[in-house]
Amino acid sequence: MTRISRRGLLQKSLGISGALLGGLPYEHRALLAQLVDRSDYGKVKEPVKGLQRGKLGQHEISRLIIGGNLISGSAHADELLYQSALMTHYFNTEKIFETWALAEQNGINTTLMRADPHIFGHYQKFTRERGGKLQWIAQSAPEQGDPVENAKRARDHGAIAIYLHGNVSDNFVKEGKAEEIGRIISGFRQAGLMAGIGAHLLATVQGCEKAKLDPDFYMVTINRVSYYSSPAAEVGEFMKSVKKPWIGFKVLGAGRDKPLEGFQHAFEKGADFIAVGMFDWQVRDDTAHVQAMLAKGVDRDRAWA
């Protein structure tokens, strides 16, 4: 039996020329594909087994971490005025719990989310009332005030680690105040948490390394589409010299790149873990991509944490 590609099926079914189809953005091509081939839509798939893990301090962390921007109402949809309302309506309490449960079923054992009341309440209910086991790495929430006090609240609600928000770190380094970052991460540790530094700019990591700050880990943006990130080649080259574990985030440019290619790229550039915001219907396939590519082996120069 001759196999017809999805692109070929589109051309035959909709009468679209290859040239026109090739000119469409990935999102539009994916949408058109669903119009003529919905064989996978809503299908229940077997959970992924054997998702790989690494170490962050004394904790075993899945190489794929489920992010929290979507459940906090942020999809980085730029000028779309309705996106926050759409996200918060979609991710009601039950949908949040369903998504976290799917993550656990597929081997993801860690989530990365803001340290704010919305997350405090949901995470505590999930772990205490629903039996959830996800570990939580917190992101400091600037609007909550002093980051060290924010860390203490995150700790009290179950976080194992916290990192300083990337925009805050970026600004401190730009202003020549890297020592302020050092003071804050020292406070994080005194609160009993692993302490990380977030960065959207490579210069932030470079400034922290030059100042000989000693975080437990870095959070660094890296992607193929230059979205809130320094050039990926430069990030990858510098991070070879950084001994601390680092978590890549915005690895798909907030949904602007394809999962398989974006994940592979981040790992090849040296990320030890990737944090990815996922809808419930993306969890299983994203996990399968990561498990398969790591099982096959990733071509990278940097040793794994």
What is each of the regions a protein language model found here?
Residues 1-17:
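N-terminal secretory signal peptides and thylakoid transit peptides that target proteins
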Residues 24-62, 298-299:
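C-terminal segment of N-terminal export signals and the immediately downstream linker at the start
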Residues 47-63, 148-156, 205-210:
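Short amphipathic alpha-helices and their capping/turn segments at secondary-structure boundaries
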Residues 60-84:
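N-terminal small/glycine-rich loop or linker at the start of catalytic domains
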Residues 65, 111-112, 163, 219, ...:
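Conserved beta-strand positions in the central sheet of alpha/beta enzyme cores
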Residues 77-93, 136-145, 173, 252-257:
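Active-site mouth loops of central-metabolism enzymes
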Residues 93, 100-124, 128-174:
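Active-site beta->alpha loop and helix N-cap motifs at the rims of alpha/beta catalytic domains
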Residues 142-145, 167-305:
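Beta/alpha (TIM)-barrel catalytic core signal, keyed to glycine-rich beta->alpha loops juxtaposed to Asp/Glu
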